[in-house]
Amino acid sequence: MYLDRFRQCPSSLQIPRSAWRLHALAAALALAGMARLAPAAAQAPQPPVAGAPHAQDAGQEGEFDHRDNTLIAVFDDGVGINLDDDPDELGETAPPTLKDIHISVEHKNPMSKPAIGVRVSGAGRALTLAGSTIDATEGGIPAVVRRGGTLELDGVTVAGGEGMEPMTVSDAGSRLSVRGGVLGGEAPGVGLVRAAQGGQASIIDATLQSILGPALIADGGSISVAGGSIDMDMGPGFPPPPPPLPGAPLAAHPPLDRVAAVHAGQDGKVTLREVALRAHGPQATGVYAYMPGSEITLQGGTVSVQGDDGAGVVAGAGLLDALPPGGTVRLDGTTVSTDGANTDAVLVRGDAARAEVVNTVLRTAKSLAAGVSAQHGGRVTLRQTRIETAGAGAEGISVLGFEPQSGSGPASVDMQGGSITTTGNRAAGIALTHGSARLEGVAVRAEGSGSSAAQLANGTLVVSAGSLASAQSGAISVTDTPLKLMPGALASSTVSVRLTDGATAQGGNGVFLQQHSTIPVAVALESGALARGDIVADGNKPLDAGISLSVASGAAWHGATQVLQSATLGKGGTWVVNADSRVQDMSMRGGRVEFQAPAPEASYKTLTLQTLDGNGVFVLNTNVAAGQNDQLRVTGRADGQHRVLVRNAGGEADSRGARLGLVHTQGQGNATFRLANVGKAVDLGTWRYSLAEDPKTHVWSLQRAGQALSGAANAAVNAADLSSIALAESNALDKRLGELRLRADAGGPWARTFSERQQISNRHARAYDQTVSGLEIGLDRGWSASGGRWYAGGLLGYTYADRTYPGDGGGKVKGLHVGGYAAYVGDGGYYLDTVLRLGRYDQQYNIAGTDGGRVTADYRTSGAAWSLEGGRRFELPNDWFAEPQAEVMLWRTSGKRYRASNGLRVKVDANTATLGRLGLRFGRRIALAGGNIVQPYARLGWTQEFKSTGDVRTNGIGHAGAGRHGRVELGAGVDAALGKGHNLYASYEYAAGDRINIPWSFHAGYRYSF
């Protein structure tokens, strides 16, 4: 029984002496947890008990009635439960915890002070109210904590109505603690809980329900909320409160242009941890920090706002500018969602207003709503945050400020990581008007019709390591926005855009930047940035548009323009021109202008400049066969030293040779142009060309440089030469047949390997080198015949040649061959052998064109070789011997037609070659113990090529074969028969001639004889 406990304890509770009256608690009962109060309220009051403790307050007295649930009714000027350190009001010590108390307060007389349900005042004064109810539906103040007092509300329900003042905690050391329960009320502009002048409020897992006014106000105090929910319902058509009169004192409710569920005034601090906050109705706002020193921190949780012209999170003064600017909001891991036209997720306004947003999601659903809006000096930093907007005209980030003369500095946004996505029509990923925005590692994408990734009117946009992309419009749009600016604000408007550190920008309609106004625009691409799309302006008038572009440090722009006033290409900067373009002033500072290679059926392009200076590279495409090419035209003064890199489609000029005009000048200035191609020459089809100026017309044209072959044609001619490979294969087998003459045997299996370096010079092509290596295996059988011995066998071999075309590149030949042979060794020293070999060869070359590109080709041919060799071995004293020999060889390869990767057409005729060789071997046969034999020798010979009929044609131009040539050959080697059936050989050779030199040739082999 509460009253029994109450009588047993000293008390300072002040009870009005007027008779108890029952209150209709319909509004309170409608709130959660209030229905249980109805039975107690329905009971009639009992007669007073004689001798009950009481105290006097405001001249009114009251008495308790003996009940389980005590009901306290408080009227104007009254206090329901008072724990006060004022000597005039001090009574006996109150119980530390009161339970199941039902307090009703009213404020009827505007000339009187409002009634107070609970008041705790004074250091050391503490009271806990549990499981109780405070009804303020008729006005009044539910609770007051001041002067260092402490009040704890545990599971308490507070119901407020019109005229209710907020529960207030004020003064340093004062604490109001709310755990669980429901706090609700209808109090326009007043609030449910107010912390002032250093007071502290802590709310845990409670439900706050505010109608037509804020739930929390921190005005010089601090409020901490953990868990639970906050709801504010503004109702339909709710107007904002009027501004305060000049000189009027600051009231409990703020004179603002918006009402928020949570307010932080001057030096007020509010922290919300994992709180679900909802605000409903026109002009509703979630949280609002609006004065110097005010701070609101959201950690986790959600903010949901429904209604037009509101906001989710706001920092800074309102549009009325009635208060000094200031306010800071911090969000970490929070989700902010708005569903209303012109209702921003985060709004920061004023020079001293700040927002810090980390790991947060910001969403807006209706038209003209921004994910982040920084206005009039406000500053916002975002880290790893996702912004999503869906309405027409919505903006992911809006930066709006006035000119300095308007009294406000520029606003700014700094965002690192995360993304910005807009899906509405006529929307913008970022909108910039007199301010600055820096995006680092942020992906910005605009999906809707007429929507741009960036819409700019004035200010600076820096995009680093991120992207700007528009699905249906230009990536960047520059436009006037007079509705967002004060009069005269456009007078000094400029737009600066800088993409750096690998940032990308691309418009879905093929436009990178669209200029809708005469605002000067400066675009800079740096440090690997890439922009794709054209730069265009309404009317395509470059002088009116005032657009300048600079590209440097590995950055590139792929697009065309007719409106650039100036373009500067710094070191490492590239402009890829994909259509006819015009620039008023071009300054080359080590950069590169590259004409995009035309697609099939596409026309070549012309870049027209009014002036040109500096130094740089121009990359132009040509098709000499069609007489078409890209052109650079300078209509005014041209200065500087420039280089021209020419890329050809692979066609061939007519018989008169190519004279394609690449660069056209007016003869004004000192500009010079030279080829940037390798060797200062251009490969065009079969021939090489140089660049020269016509002194009369001042046109720089390509002219054929004599009979020099292009790199591709040179490789095609040299690749067709297989006779040198056939000679290397034949030489390997010669060693095997020579070994048969060492001693008679029944034949057997054998294996040989060889490698030799060849330096070859063709008559109509440049010299090249190749290393030919191979492996052969075979099996033969020997039998005795009249006057000698016969051998017959077969072979299988693989050959690999690695070719080097000096200054151009290289190639490879891979061949497989099979063959058969027969040999006769007479008893009188005569011998005769013949070989037939059939092969298949895969020929490849890969060379560097003079334009820096690669030219490749790969084709296959077949070949056949037949040789006949004869000689006689003369035995000399002391086991010396001399062996003269002669050989004839026929070689034929099939023809082939193919096209190289650059379009060069190649026709290789079938080739027939005839060779003859005369030679002499001189050596000594050395018999060793056990029947072993070692035979060292030296060799001298001459090889002559008598005929070569195969020609090579490139683009229809013929190149004759190598013709007659010869070479001298020197060599040394050793043959050995060791043990039973084991035979080894090794040799070295050198050859020199007018067409082929062999600096070294090594052979080694083994056979086993039966």
Curated annotation (Swiss-Prot):
Residues 1-42 form the signal peptide. The record marks N731, A732 as: Cleavage. SUPFAM superfamilies: Autotransporter, Pectin lyase-like. SMART domains: Autotransporter (SM00869). Keywords: Cell outer membrane, Membrane, Periplasm, Secreted, Signal, Transmembrane, Transmembrane beta strand, Virulence. Residues 742-1010 form the Autotransporter domain. GO terms for cellular component: cell outer membrane; cell surface; extracellular region; periplasmic space. PANTHER family: AUTOTRANSPORTER, C-TERMINAL REGION OF AIDA-LIKE PROTEIN. Inhibits the classical pathway of complement activation and prevents accumulation of deposited C4. The signal peptide, cleaved at the inner membrane, guides the autotransporter protein to the periplasmic space. Then, insertion of the C-terminal translocator domain in the outer membrane forms a hydrophilic pore for the translocation of the passenger domain to the bacterial cell surface, with subsequent cleavage. Finally, the mature protein remains tightly associated with the bacterium. This is BrkA autotransporter.
